[in-house]
A protein has these predicted regions:
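Formylglycine-dependent sulfatase
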Residues: 1-528, 532, 541-560, 596-604, ...
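Short aromatic-centered micro-motifs
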Residues: 178, 506, 648, 704-705
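Residue-level detection of beta-strand-connecting loop/turn positions
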Residues: 182, 510, 663, 704-708
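Core structural elements
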Residues: 226-231, 583-593
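Hydrophobic residues embedded in beta-strands of well-ordered beta-sheets
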Residues: 504, 512, 653-656, 702
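Extracellular glycan-recognition modules
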Residues: 589-656
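Short, aromatic/His-centered strand-loop micro-motif at the edge of beta-sheets
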Residues: 661-681, 690-691
Length: 712
């Protein structure tokens, strides 16, 4: 704030005002708008403008007006990439070494971006920009996502004036868990009405920009737009999936060959780039003799029977339709910007947050939640829902073979920061008024932490020394503005270190060293026993030729550099916890370790970070209910939904309880007779008796009660 320059006398009539210290900040004239568009779980060989077979006309439109980055890299996972993108720093620097659900209370991994590493939204808001966040957030700890929690890490507390979207890493695209600014809301429609979250996100993006433009037409804005696509569930209208009928019947291995040829012809990879093996580490054992995870293993296409091929192809068709439908919605945003005369003066940055996801496992899934519970889908179970893939009945994900294909020509998948399949991603940057290059490619090595420093550079903005009065730490990223003007320009970037879920990598001057370590939830640990590889990645993009035996000095140099960079950027401790270790670690939940919860009708939904924790333990649910009619019905208590959870409800005058195991099996217990009219205490009690053999799945007895009397 500037000092008051007016004059103060006894009488206001003799005084001179000065509004300067109190005026809102104003952006410089002709400041560009900024649009960050972040896709989810979309491998580099997915879109047609990057050599894939999925038609993305809106993305092609941006690419034709800008530059595609052929060596753009992320962190291998969503929350860390988004934190790095918005701050211009390494994810570990800002406490986001992994996703919010896995944070563990260390400086590198606490899930809370510190105030001394401001987001682009905070910087631009202080420079007179309107700021909007629409879609996926995933930068708030689980324990801070409830109506009772602090909102200090919600979008509206981190520089965004308006927010509409979902707080977590994924949501149902038909029935999303939505938040508007700082309170939950219901979707404005249903699938039967034509509702889909991708359309809703585009609608809100246009609405937010338009709302301000009608008042101050020249005020610039920053919009951070993050659709759910292509993260599971792959939900889309059937007609969009049907556009791809038969187009993936060649299988994922043939897709790789087609995509690589296209990438070469488009100048996206060197002409001598090779395809990596489909299962490069199938014979690798963990430090205690553990096999390579089955969930991270591709089934060769030729080994599939006709029914499996039909199922796997349809899952890819649904995914492709999901992306193309969402691309069409993004196209509507571009249309609005063009029609309103804003497009040419808008810096557009498009990225995917990590490589294609292998979380569908070897057989794909009709319910992605099974992956996170250690279950692999069977083809027989999935075929029962074949005609419903992409619809509300499924929470679907394609088989890991398609992840390999969509990451062509690279090894491995999302979660693996050790390999290009996890970290090499699509990226486009466009600004017709400021970047002369149109339809070109750049081969410079770029990391997601370099994006915001480059945008600052394009805007001639010096990163502020303080934001909201808080002194700022320096940016970690390096601007590549010079390379946008001249492909031969040296950006000055020499090193980039990686760590994710127990995997490690380090890039330095065209060389890349990495560990061979199965990612979470493998739980291998023993990081001191990791095997390392080294590649001359400037000449071997797909990590096909390990030179560790030929270049031992180079390997030792890069290993030492990894530890040096880790010390600089909070790279330790390493974590590859298995599911049970993750679930049983302490987290500072606001509700504490309570044994009793009271819920009331008509209150906001309670999320997983604040709800009663009933997993793996005995519990009881009691409801104070007045039944005033025969044949009464209604839900008394529900956790979860159609794809996993439990519910206590009244139907046809009787009390019922359903336990839904991952959408696959439902266990129903019903009262023997109807509930008498009047006020009653209705309930269910579960007593744990043990676990299923060779698993952590609990077993127990369940009883229904009327007024403490067992009835079922």
């Amino acid at each position: 704030m500037t000092e008051f320059q007016g004059k103060i006398e006894l009488d206001i009539r003799d005084s001179e005002p000065d509004w300067g210290p109190y005026a809102a900040p104003t952006a410089p004239e002709n400041s560009p708008n900024v649009l960050y568009l972040v896709w989810d779980d979309t491998g580099i060989a997915t879109w047609d403008c990057f050599g894939g077979l999925v038609e993305m006309p809106a993305m092609t439109r941006v690419a034709e007006r800008g530059v595609r980055l052929t060596q753009f890299h992320t962190t291998a996972l969503c929350s860390p990439t988004r934190a790095s993108l918005l701050t211009g720093r390494n994810a570990t620097t800002v406490g986001m070494a992994t996703i919010e659900e896995f944070t563990d209370g260390f400086p590198n991994c606490n899930g809370r971006i510190p105030a001394d590493t401001a987001l682009l939204s905070e910087v631009l808001n202080e420079r007179g920009y309107n700021t909007y966040c629409v879609g996926k957030w995933h930068l708030t700890p689980l324990e801070e996502c409830s109506m009772a929690s602090t909102k200090r890490h919600w979008p509206t507390s981190r520089g965004f004036e308006r927010f509409y979207g979902f707080m977590g890493g994924e949501t149902d695209q038909w029935y999303p868990d939505l938040v508007y600014d700082n309170h939950p809301v219901n979707p404005p429609g249903t699938p039967e009405d034509g509702y889909h979250l991708s359309k809703d996100i585009a609608d809100k993006t246009i609405e937010f920009i338009r709302d301000a433009k009608v008042i101050v037409p020249d005020k610039p804005w920053f919009s951070y737009v993050c659709p759910g696509a292509g993260h599971a569930p792959h939900h889309v209208f059937k007609e969009w999936a049907d556009k791809y009928a038969g187009k993936f019947d060649m299988g994922y291995e043939r897709y790789r060959e087609i995509a690589l040829e296209k990438q070469k012809s488009m100048g996206l990879v060197p002409p001598d780039t090779e395809l990596s093996p489909i299962n490069p580490y199938l014979d690798v054992k963990g430090p205690q003799g553990e096999p390579w995870p089955l969930q991270d293993t591709v089934r060769p296409w030729d080994s599939l029977n006709d029914e499996e091929k039909r199922l796997f192809s349809r899952m890819a068709e649904v995914f492709a339709g999901f992306l193309s439908y969402t691309d069409a919605q993004i196209g509507r945003i571009l249309d609005y910007l063009e029609e309103s005369g804003q497009l040419d003066n808008t810096i557009i940055v498009v990225i995917s947050d990590n490589g294609a996801s292998g979380e569908g496992g070897p057989n794909g899934s009709v319910n992605e939640g099974k992956f996170f519970n250690g279950y692999i889908d069977t083809v027989e179970e999935s075929m029962k829902l074949f005609d419903h893939l992409g619809g509300p009945e499924t929470y679907n994900h394609y088989p890991i073979g398609w992840a390999m294909a969509f990451n062509t020509p690279y090894k491995l998948y999302k979660r693996y920061a050790s390999h290009e399949g996890g970290i090499a991603d699509s990226a486009i940057i466009s600004w017709p008024n400021g970047i002369a290059a149109h339809g070109e490619v750049r081969d410079n090595y770029v990391n997601v932490s370099d994006i915001t420093p480059t945008v600052y550079d394009l805007m001639n903005v010096t990163p502020p020394e303080t934001v909201k009065g808080i002194p700022q730490n320096p940016l970690d990223g390096v601007s590549f503005k010079a390379a946008l003007a001249d492909p031969a320009a040296d950006t000055g970037k020499t090193t980039q270190f990686y760590t994710m879920l127990g995997t490690r990598g380090i890039w330095h001057d065209g060389w890349f060293a990495n560990t061979v370590h199965a990612a979470t939830p493998a739980g291998w640990s023993h990081f001191d026993q990791d095997r390392w590889e080294v590649y001359h990645i400037a000449k071997d993009r797909s990590q096909c030729h390990d030179l560790a035996g030929e270049q031992p000095e180079k390997l030792e140099e890069l290993k030492a550099l990894w530890f040096s960079e880790a010390a600089k950027y909070n790279g330790l401790p390493l974590a590859d916890l298995n599911l049970m270790e993750t679930l049983t670690r302490f987290r500072p939940y606001l509700v504490g370790e309570r044994n009793s919860y009271v819920y009331y009708p008509d209150c906001a939904d309670v999320g997983i970070g604040a709800a009663a924790e009933i997993r793996g333990r005995s519990f009881a649910v009691l409801a104070d209910v007045t039944v005033d009619t025969t044949g009464a019905e209604g839900v008394l208590f529900k956790q979860g939904g159609a794809h996993g959870g439990h519910v206590l409800f009244i139907q046809d005058g009787r009390l019922h309880y359903v336990y839904n195991f991952l959408g696959e099996r439902q266990q129903l217990v019903s009262s023997a007779g109807p509930i008498p009219l009047g006020r009653h205490l209705l309930g269910v009690r579960y007593e744990r008796k043990g676990t299923v053999a060779n698993s952590h799945t609990p077993l127990g007895d369940l009883t229904l009660y009327f007024d403490h009397n067992p009835v079922g």
